[in-house]
Amino acid sequence: LGKNAAWSEQLQLGMNTWRRNLDRSLSPDFLGYHGVAIADVDGDDLEDVYLCQPGGLPNLLLKQQADGTWGDISKKARVDWLDNTTAALLVDLDNDGDKDLALATRTAFLISENNGKGRFSLRERLSNLGSGYSPTAADYDLDGDLDLLILRYASDNNKTGDFPTPHPF
């Protein structure tokens, strides 16, 4: 990553740099580390890396090149979200053979569909879930398709003792 601008201009600088330099209105959250997801996003049989970032810094999609170097394709792939992102999943949510992107942010859960060539389109923005952490995917109900489980920490209930219920999408 040494010759990659994402490394030298963002990752190498560390959290203290961003804590001092990001506008407070972005509410950068530096509690713990942010997530990472690894999968082949463009069908070249090389694993790529998605790095979640605190608010105000673009999330990064780093594409592995055949020569072992890495290129930042975040903007081209349309996944350079500036939202405070806590976790990511790269998993085939629509059963078309490629890896889609699911992101837990402090304000919403985002699901972006992959076109098979590493370009993503936002398909769902679930704002009513609040801030999510640690999403996982499995066929929980055994119906043949993947389901998402999104965990939340210290979230409010609806004041009647009920907690969030499933949200189909």
Residue locations for each model-derived region?
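Short loop/turn segments that connect beta-strands within beta-propeller blades
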Residues: 65-68, 114-118
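Short, solvent-exposed loop/turn segments at conserved positions within beta-propeller repeat blades
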Residues: 54-57, 107, 168-169
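Beta-propeller fold detector
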Residues: 1-2, 71-76, 121-125
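Hydrophobic beta-strand segments that make up the repeating blades of beta-propeller
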Residues: 48-53, 99-105, 148-152
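A short loop-to-beta-strand structural motif that recurs across blades of beta-propeller domains
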Residues: 60-62, 108-110
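Short, conserved, GDST-rich strand-edge loop motifs in beta-rich repeat architectures
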Residues: 152-169
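Beta-propeller blade termini
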Residues: 33-43, 63, 84-95, 113, ...
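Repeat-based blade/solenoid architectures
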Residues: 5-35, 77-89, 125-136
